């Protein structure tokens, strides 16, 4: 389970890093669009990298 969470966080970080170049072009539109359609309940580690989510398991 820990490996799965680690891989998911790593993939999320890679996707965020690759989106940085596009984010400058779109002035942060992609990030606002993402936050509007995905709640923190769906991705509990998105906001603070899951200080609560990782330790609860």
From Swiss-Prot:
The keyword Signal applies. InterPro entries: Histatin/statherin (IPR030773). Its cofactor is Zn(2+); Cu(2+). One of its GO terms (biological process) is defense response to fungus. Keywords: Antibiotic, Antimicrobial, Biomineralization, Endoplasmic reticulum, Fungicide, Membrane, Mitochondrion, Phosphoprotein, Secreted, Signal, Sulfation. The modification Phosphoserine is found at residue 21. Residues 51-56 are annotated as: Involved in wound healing. The modification Sulfotyrosine is found at residues 46, 49, 53, 55. The keyword Transmembrane helix does not apply. The recommended nomenclature of salivary peptides follows published guidelines. In agreement with the authors, it has been decided to indicate the boundaries of the peptides according to the positions within the precursor, and not in the mature protein, as has formerly been proposed. Histatin 1, histatin 3 and histatin 5 constitute more than 80% of the total histatin concentration. Histatins (Hsts) are cationic and histidine-rich secreted peptides mainly synthesized by saliva glands of humans and higher primates. Hsts are considered to be major precursors of the protective proteinaceous structure on tooth surfaces (enamel pellicle). Hsts can be divided into two major groups according to their biological functions: antimicrobial Hsts (e.g. Hst 5/HTN3) and cell-activating Hsts (e.g. Hst 1/HTN1 and Hst 2/HTN1). Hst 1/HTN1 and Hst 2/HTN1 act in different cell types (epithelium, fibroblasts and endothelium) in oral and non-oral mucosa. PANTHER family: HISTATIN-1, STATHERIN. This is Histatin-1.
